[in-house]
């Protein structure tokens, strides 16, 4: 009920022809690609490498390794192909689009984890086992600039009912 009310009352940004054109181009590029890379194989490699190098318990060394793996996977993603060229109910196209988004999110996650030199919540750096509120009690906003570099901005954490304290088990 709350989601429906929010959707009804929300102020949406206008969808421009430029945005539609970018989306159409991405779809057509995938449908017309004659590359040899298969979406399922790339997705499986992404899943396994993220589990091996960027799951809850991480080190800078493993995260750096994953950065390189992601570069390779993103390069290979440019050479994917799909068999279904249709416009209706094309689940293969949806999976190809989703893989592209997964690669982008993985890149932001790995760079953010590498940048954050502490452990906090589900982000456990074995090479930085302590929480560092002085330097890292903030939200990380990752974004890409035109040259492909991942950059960061930060937003303060608003404390209230729950103050940070050491975990004791």
Regions found by a protein language model. Name each.
Residues 1-169:
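Glycine- and aromatic-enriched mobile tails/lids
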């Amino acid at each position: 009920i709350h989601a429906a009310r929010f959707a009804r009352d929300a102020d949406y940004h206008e969808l421009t022809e430029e945005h539609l054109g970018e989306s159409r181009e991405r779809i057509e590029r995938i449908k017309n690609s004659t590359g040899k890379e298969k979406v399922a194989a790339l997705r499986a490699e992404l899943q396994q490498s993220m589990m091996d190098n960027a799951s809850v318990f991480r080190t800078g060394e493993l995260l750096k390794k994953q950065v390189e793996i992601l570069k390779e996977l993103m390069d290979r993603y440019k050479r994917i192909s799909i068999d279904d060229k249709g416009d209706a109910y094309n689940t293969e196209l949806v999976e190809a689009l989703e893989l592209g988004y997964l690669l982008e999110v993985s890149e932001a996650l790995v760079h953010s984890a590498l940048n954050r030199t502490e452990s906090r919540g589900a982000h456990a750096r074995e090479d930085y086992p302590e929480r560092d509120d002085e330097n890292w009690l903030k939200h990380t906003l990752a974004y890409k600039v035109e040259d492909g570099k991942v950059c960061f901005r930060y937003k303060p954490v608003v404390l209230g009912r729950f103050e940070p304290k050491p975990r004791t088990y």
